[in-house]
């Protein structure tokens, strides 16, 4: 699953999840060399250093909640878990995000929190390691592709996603409003042609006085 990928782990991430990452073919590295940055606590000093870094400020780094790995471990289809659902924003933004869209996905699934210490058993890790070794040749073929599917701020490869109830209310901020919340208009749709139907179109330059334009139009 993570063959050849490098991950950095905050001190807030459990050893079980780190072992799962390695068992699935991933390696652990420092944050500068990592393809993925994982944390379970946005207020942890390790994670705060990431948020305060130039890479993060310039949008060249993204922190993900490490329970993404737990979701992968418990999923019937490993690549069916969308990484983007687990973006971990700075603590100062989380209250406002919860107010607008509800709790984060890892907060809703109490299974993650209750079974934190037994998410991945030693036997499961052994099995995963064996499966990872069997899949090595296949992964090598994939790595020859000219496309790089994972970068510092990952662009998640195309994969099967399962629908979530009340999406995106029970997920992260998407930046898009639901179609159900949009105002509805009845009647026929017509092309807008400037100068017809009593409407005109104007190009408004920067630093222009809108009040002066309105007064000029009224005088006409």
Curated annotation (Swiss-Prot):
Compartment(s): Chromosome, Telomere; Nucleus inner membrane
| GO cellular component labels | chromosome, telomeric region; nuclear inner membrane
* GO BP annotations, alphabetical order: double-strand break repair involved in meiotic recombination; homologous chromosome pairing at meiosis; meiotic attachment of telomere to nuclear envelope; meiotic telomere clustering; oogenesis; spermatogenesis; synaptonemal complex assembly
The record's listing under Pfam families reads: TERB2 (PF15101)
Its principal location?
nucleus
Matching InterPro entries? TERB2
Signal sequence coordinates: none
Name the keywords, alphabetized.
Chromosome, Membrane, Nucleus, Telomere
Disease per record is:
Spermatogenic failure 59: An autosomal recessive male infertility disorder characterized by non-obstructive azoospermia, due to sperm maturation arrest.
Q: Which family does it belong to?
A: Belongs to the TERB2 family.
Record's subunit section = Component of the MAJIN-TERB1-TERB2 complex, composed of MAJIN, TERB1 and TERB2.
Q: Which PANTHER family match?
A: TELOMERE REPEATS-BINDING BOUQUET FORMATION PROTEIN 2
Functional summary from the UniProt entry: Meiosis-specific telomere-associated protein involved in meiotic telomere attachment to the nucleus inner membrane, a crucial step for homologous pairing and synapsis. Component of the MAJIN-TERB1-TERB2 complex, which promotes telomere cap exchange by mediating attachment of telomeric DNA to the inner nuclear membrane and replacement of the protective cap of telomeric chromosomes: in early meiosis, the MAJIN-TERB1-TERB2 complex associates with telomeric DNA and the shelterin/telosome complex.
**What protein name applies here?**
Telomere repeats-binding bouquet formation protein 2
């Amino acid at each position: 699953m993570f063959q050849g990928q490098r991950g950095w782990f905050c001190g807030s991430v459990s050893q079980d999840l780190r072992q799962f990452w390695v068992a699935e073919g991933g390696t652990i590295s420092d944050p500068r060399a990592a393809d993925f940055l994982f944390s379970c606590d946005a207020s942890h000093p390790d994670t705060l250093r990431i948020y305060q870094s130039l890479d993060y400020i310039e949008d060249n780094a993204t922190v993900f909640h490490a329970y993404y790995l737990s979701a992968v471990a418990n999923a019937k289809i490993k690549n069916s878990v969308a990484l983007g659902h687990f973006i971990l924003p700075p603590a100062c933004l989380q209250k406002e995000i919860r107010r607008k869209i509800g709790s984060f996905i890892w907060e809703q699934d109490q299974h993650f929190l209750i079974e934190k210490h037994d998410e991945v058993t030693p036997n499961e890790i052994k099995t995963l390691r064996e499966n990872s070794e069997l899949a090595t040749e296949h992964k090598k073929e994939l790595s020859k592709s000219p496309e790089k599917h994972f970068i510092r701020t990952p662009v998640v490869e195309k994969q099967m996603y399962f629908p979530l109830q009340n999406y995106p209310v029970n997920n992260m901020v998407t930046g898009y409003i639901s179609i159900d919340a949009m105002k509805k208009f009845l009647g026929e749709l017509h092309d807008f042609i400037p100068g017809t139907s009593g409407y005109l179109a104007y190009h408004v330059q920067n630093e222009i006085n809108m009040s002066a334009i309105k007064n000029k139009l009224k005088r006409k």
